Regions:
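Short secondary-structure boundary/capping segments
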Residues: 6-7, 59, 73, 96-99, ...
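Residue-level detector of flexible, active-site-proximal loop/helix-junction positions
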Residues: 21, 58, 64, 111-114, ...
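A generic local structural motif
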Residues: 68-71, 93-95, 108-113, 183, ...
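Glycine-rich dinucleotide-binding loop and its adjacent helix/turn
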Residues: 22, 26, 32-35, 85-142, ...
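Generic domain-boundary/flexible-linker signal
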Residues: 62, 92-93, 157
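Sequence-level motif detector for i,i+2 pairs with an aromatic at +2
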Residues: 12, 64, 102-104, 212
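Feature captures the FAD/FMN-dependent oxidoreductase FAD-binding
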Residues: 28-89, 209, 214-216, 222
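Glycine-rich active-site loop/strand segments that organize a redox cofactor
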Residues: 2-38, 149-207, 211-212, 218-222
């Protein structure tokens, strides 16, 4: 459920799981989605994890000796629960999309795969965080005129003083900040993802670059 060219925003070396990490020869590269899936599958094999796919969790509650997890395949007892569903599993489609003329097709990042699936003509990309910026760049390079609706976004360099920005964040402890020590948790949870792209040339991807290659920037859609 991701576009074909998507790569992780984090370098390979930053893929760290308990007693398991990156084992390849390109630690500063960026994994594709098939490579990411293979990495997780290999980890499951190494630790003999009883992976259950297609399972719906209906509730989680604390009990005396840990947690009780109710699912559509039974009840589990465990000492710890990791919620890693991500923030983008359900597309956030603005209500104004329902008022668009029938002749205008709409796609969400969940359904978008590559520019070949799009109709001929110009494209409006709504949102300019990591996903929106990457998709806008890709569609523009396919030869279509692209307009990008921009809100509040965070611009960072891919490389700072010779180091990947994720290395800087990791070294500074930013990635380890506990949620209960954040000044404004509501704002933090709503801060858009960094404008980054994982690429072999480690290039920057921000509004300036998009403007330079010909992407038209406008304000918020709603």
């Amino acid at each position: 459920e991701r576009w074909d060219s998507l790569r992780l925003l984090t370098p390979n070396w930053l893929s760290r799981l308990p007693s398991y990490g990156y084992e390849g020869d390109d630690p500063h590269g960026f994994r594709t989605m098939p490579e990411t899936i293979a990495f997780l599958e290999r980890y499951a094999e190494v630790i003999s994890a009883p992976v259950l796919t297609g399972t719906t969790v209906t509730s989680v509650r604390r009990v005396l000796d840990g947690y009780e997890v109710l699912t559509d395949r039974g009840t589990w007892q465990c000492q710890a629960v990791v919620i890693a569903t991500g923030a983008c599993n359900i597309p956030n489609v603005p209500a104004v999309a329902e008022a668009l003329p029938r002749g205008i097709d709409t796609e969400t990042p969940k359904d978008y795969r590559n520019p070949d699936q799009l109709e001929e003509g110009g494209e409006l990309v709504v949102g300019a965080s990591a996903s929106g910026a990457q998709i806008a760049e890709e569609i523009h390079r396919s030869g279509r005129p692209v307009t990008l609706a921009v809100g509040e976004h965070i611009r960072v360099p891919r490389v700072y003083r010779g180091r990947d920005i994720k290395w800087c964040m990791d070294a500074a402890g930013v990635l380890d900040d506990p949620y209960d020590e954040v000044d404004n948790i509501v704002r933090v949870r709503n801060v858009p993802s960094l404008q980054l792209v994982g690429s072999d040339d480690r290039r920057n991807l921000d509004l300036n670059r998009l403007t330079d290659i010909g992407v038209r920037l406008v304000g918020r859609l709603v």
